[in-house]
Amino acid sequence: GYRITDKAKILENLVYNHLLYKGYDIKVGYYGDKEIDFIGEKNGEKIYIQVALKIDSDKTAEGEFGNLLKIQDNYPKIVVTEDTFSGNSYEGIRHCPIRQFLME
């Protein structure tokens, strides 16, 4: 049978399916040349989400948070990872473990 072994793709699928379950219309977006993994829209509100396995270096953090930092509106921006700690944010962008994200 078919088996996905790419953990990053599995994590993205979890986030995508959770957003669908919550009733969001989902798009992949770009801001300039920067990809935004998911832009969810529901009832006139937006949510921007980047998905990464881990934020284990400044370069990874710069890439994941940097794409969202370029968006100049006041809608929520979240980086979802498989990390287990919670509560961190970076310049107003929330860093959320997947387990916590799925319970919201």
Predicted regions and their residues:
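A cross-kingdom feature that marks ATP-driven nucleic-acid transaction machinery
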Residues: 1-104
